[in-house]
Amino acid sequence: MQKIVKAKKPFIYPNNSNFKLAVWEEWAKVGGQSTGERPLEKFYESLSYHVDLPTLWQNKKEARLCFCEGASLRFDTFPDYLTHEVIPMFWDCWPKYWGVTEKWIKKHNVRTVFFTSSQTADHFRQLFPERNIFHIPEAIETELYKDEKKLRDRTIDYLEFGRCSRIVDSSKFDSSIRVLSSFNEKSGLATRTDLINALSNSKITIALTRLDNQPEIAEGIDTLTQRYWECMLSGVILLGRAPQELIDFIGYDPTVQINLQDVNSQIIHIKENIESYQELVDKNRQTALQLGDWKLRIKEIRKILLDLGYSL
């Protein structure tokens, strides 16, 4: 009998977003089955991070698709791994989590795994050639992002948000560069909607991967993040560097290579020649609309599962 795959709804953190929820919602929209709510999950959240119980048995009729992070693998899959075959889909499974993840896959007899990092998928494919290991590129909800203004009509020259501020200090920019920073409490970038609106009115932002801004965590892993899709969809110039897996996936480099020795002069030069970048950002938006949505990834995941003999 084919096992029916049911997805588990990710935990909803109080006063915080969970990006994995968007993937589960797309699964549900196309008719994918889901499990019920986890009873009392807020009470066992802390404990399940640190305790890895054995699999008691595996249900012969159902498998569970669980959306996981390397740091929260045990919680993201609890209590499902006790009684079901788990099919994990991983984000942020950095090398420091590989040892724990390898042991967990063996311990719970996991047969099928998805990773958003191609390098991480390659690593586990070499470890487990007999198991089903797949790379599913990062994606986003493309319909949320807008591109209503041409670059010349935007009022924010440089939008600063996220970890990239560790690389570039906007406080040292020329006063002619109009900066909006998420680190300024008065900027009004308190919500995701605020960020989406700011992106659509910005000309330039920095786009780098964790390999650039936190190499001690990345440890050589260079992977696509939602930041690239956000900026491409919003028609913003990505000043930085693209991971090779993004270049391979879309067929070109969507960024303007950053000169870390003189970012200030580079931004001024881009401002003075802003209309020459319109063609690139238009191409980036169309590419992101065509290739960057979670709907496409869920379609791919469903096909893989059916090809492997699971039932939906």
Segments and roles (model prediction):
Residues M1-A63, F67-F78, F90-Y252, R297, ...:
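Nucleotide-sugar donor-binding catalytic core of glycosyltransferases
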Residues V23, D262, E272-N273:
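Acidic/polar helix N-cap motif
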Residues N59, A198, Q266-I270, I304:
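CheY-like receiver
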Residues T83-F90:
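Short beta-strand/loop segments at the ligand-binding rim of alpha/beta enzyme cores
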Residues Q226, I258-Q261, G292:
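Residue-level signal for the nucleotide or nucleotide-sugar donor/cofactor binding architecture
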Residues L238, P254-N259, I304-L312:
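Short, contiguous hydrophobic alpha-helices characteristic of membrane insertion segments
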Residues K271-L306, S311:
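A charged, aromatic-enriched C-terminal amphipathic alpha-helix characteristic of glycosyltransferases
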